[in-house]
Amino acid sequence: MKNRLVLIVLLVASFFIFLFFYNKYRVAPSFQLFQMPLYDVQGNQTSLESFRGKKFIITFYASWCRDCLVELKALNEIKSARFPDVEIICITDDPPEKLSDFIQKKNYPFRFFRSTKDFPELKIYSIPVNYLVNSSGQVVMEKVGAIDWEDNSLVTRAMNLLQ
């Protein structure tokens, strides 16, 4: 009887561990970035189509996400020196007033947009999620979780991928 109880507890624990990692590292493999409708801070609808032909980094973030805030701060610190010709595009599913407050409070030189859908509807279950897109419109790197922008080798790799 004791062995059966231990087995049941292990199976249940294994199931929840599996679900945690499955959701944490799951990103939509055929994500249509350029067709995704977005709203700017003024409430105007737009899409990433207007960035076609440019190099850009997209980060899906939330104002309450600690890892997202750390990553945005690090990106801000290296943007002008390491990525002067790369647009940084930040997409949130926060309400419009939170987006506006966040932009005013942080004053980052990034482009901020609000998704028309909640992240789970986009199959984004863990944030931040980052995409590096070259000037040909190809996603050259995607990463679930914060990128360590203080790691010089990673920044160099990102710069090379964006070329």
Can you annotate each of these PLM segments?
Residues S47-R66:
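Short active-site neighborhood of thiol/selenol oxidoreductases, capturing the structured segment around
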Residues L69-K106, K117-P120:
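Structural microenvironment flanking redox-active thiols in thiol-disulfide oxidoreductases
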Residues I57-I58, I88, N130:
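Hydrophobic beta-strand anchors of alpha/beta hydrolase catalytic cores
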Residues I17-L48:
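N-terminal "domain-start" segment that seeds a small globular fold
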Residues M1-R4:
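Positively charged n-region of N-terminal signal peptides that target proteins for export
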Residues V6-F20:
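Hydrophobic membrane-insertion alpha-helices, especially the h-region
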Residues Q104-Y108, R114-N160:
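Thiol/disulfide oxidoreductase modules built on the thioredoxin-like
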Residues S63-V70, V129:
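C-type cytochrome heme c attachment motif
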